[in-house]
Amino acid sequence: MSVVGTPKSAEQIQQEWDTNPRWKDVTRTYSAEDVVALQGSVVEEHTLARRGAEVLWEQLHDLEWVNALGALTGNMAVQQVRAGLKAIYLSGWQVAGDANLSGHTYPDQSLYPANSVPQVVRRINNALQRADQIAKIEGDTSVENWLAPIVADGEAGFGGALNVYELQKALIAAGVAGSHWEDQLASEKKCGHLGGKVLIPTQQHIRTLTSARLAADVADVPTVVIARTDAEAATLITSDVDERDQPFITGERTREGFYRTKNGIEPCIARAKAYAPFADLIWMETGTPDLEAARQFSEAVKAEYPDQMLAYNCSPSFNWKKHLDDATIAKFQKELAAMGFKFQFITLAGFHALNYSMFDLAYGYAQNQMSAYVELQEREFAAEERGYTATKHQREVGAGYFDRIATTVDPNSSTTALTGSTEEGQFH
């Protein structure tokens, strides 16, 4: 009988946890025996997820910082990697707004089907794989790693610990490298820059993080787990049961039964310290781009956990020039990196790039017809000097790659797609 997929023994797993530097700062409340018990007799290999997680972990330690833009389509991710970015961010907000499986437009309130983000992860990985295949048959070595790691939004888990476990499983199966989980009540979940957020107790979020880690361990993938706290803005909490939350709870109740709690950086610090043993990175969601607040947060967390890596949302919800001058904006990410914010990302970059670029083209087209489109085409031609390739759209989506399949099957094929195409005739 084949031994492919045979799980590791509990002893092997425990040795890995004890000796691999990857796990030196990670606390698990379950045993290697628990993992083995949950694996069954065959463990499926998740190549893209494993590779992505390992690459992301290396980047976080080898690069000054890893920066990413939010993508909501496969082609967006391809252009990001072509342009030089090393990682991809996938925002639940963008999936809600324009990429979910229900086909509706939603605000960021966990209203879309829970398997939507894994589906977009799969779509992005498929697009990156196609770009890699095209590059290989063309002998194009300009991009070192087409399969850039994807960090995806697990939101508040769409329920309890079991929902988190299943969502993490689906993300890993789709090829995710890392996932983040926020400490909001899933049924009342809001975008970090909306009002009405309700926190869950600190211990309950530790269960979320533990469940996400357990799912990765059962899959035998070193997924990067990111803890997010919304305590900087949230003024409600479901319960006063956790002693760590009690110093911030005012004693007032709302008509829904929630407790009012003090928001600000102090509850964020308290929660970050509680989450640190269970998370590879910690993200404090903020309402403004504030370097001093970031420094205060970093120093407080690192005083107790000096090796703790942090993440920062350089959000489009900030009116950047209202808060910062040009010089501060230019050095913003570098200064964050010096504080330990190793993963920095613009969550909704894809939404804004897509909407503005199409509005700009459509406005010009409405006024000036073909002249507006030709201006876009000329900008594409000019961008080829910087590595842009999508001017040749047939090539970009793999017509040449599938011609190669056709001629491999039949070297004398007379039905290849690019031969005789307008692209071959006009774009060389």
From Swiss-Prot:
- The kind of enzyme this is, by top-level EC class, is lyase
Induction (record text) = Activated by PrpR and repressed by RamB.
What Gene Ontology cellular-component terms does the record carry? Answer: cytosol; extracellular region; plasma membrane
Which cofactors must be present for this protein to function? Answer: Mg(2+)
Q: Which Gene3D superfamilies match?
A: Phosphoenolpyruvate-binding domains (3.20.20.60)
- Substrates-to-products reaction catalysed: D-threo-isocitrate = glyoxylate + succinate
Q: Which UniProt keywords apply?
A: Glyoxylate bypass, Isopeptide bond, Lyase, Magnesium, Manganese, Metal-binding, Tricarboxylic acid cycle, Ubl conjugation
Which parts of the chain are coiled coil?
A: none
Q: How is it modified after translation?
A: Pupylated at Lys-334 by the prokaryotic ubiquitin-like protein Pup, which leads to its degradation by the proteasome.
Give residues for the crosslink Isoglutamyl lysine isopeptide (Lys-Gln) (interchain with Q-Cter in protein Pup). Answer: K334
Annotated cofactor note: Can also use Mn(2+) ion.
| Pfam short name (any one) | ICL
Q: What is its EC number?
A: 4.1.3.1
The cysteines covalently paired via disulfide bonds are: none
* InterPro entries assigned: Isocitrate_lyase (IPR006254), Isocitrate_lyase_ph_CS (IPR018523), Pyrv/PenolPyrv_kinase-like_dom (IPR015813), Pyrv_kinase-like_dom_sf (IPR040442)
Return the SUPFAM superfamilies for the record: Phosphoenolpyruvate/pyruvate domain
Deletion phenotype:
Cells lacking this gene show an attenuated bacterial persistence and virulence in immune-competent mice without affecting bacterial growth during the acute phase of infection.
> What job does this protein perform?
Involved in the persistence and virulence of M.tuberculosis. Catalyzes the reversible formation of succinate and glyoxylate from isocitrate, a key step of the glyoxylate cycle, which operates as an anaplerotic route for replenishing the tricarboxylic acid cycle during growth on fatty acid substrates. It could also catalyze the formation of pyruvate and succinate from 2-methylisocitrate, a key step in the methylcitrate cycle (propionate degradation route).
Q: Which family does it belong to?
A: Belongs to the isocitrate lyase/PEP mutase superfamily. Isocitrate lyase family.
Protein name in the entry: Isocitrate lyase
Which organism does this sequence originate in? Mycobacterium tuberculosis (strain ATCC 25618 / H37Rv)
Q: Which gene encodes it?
A: icl
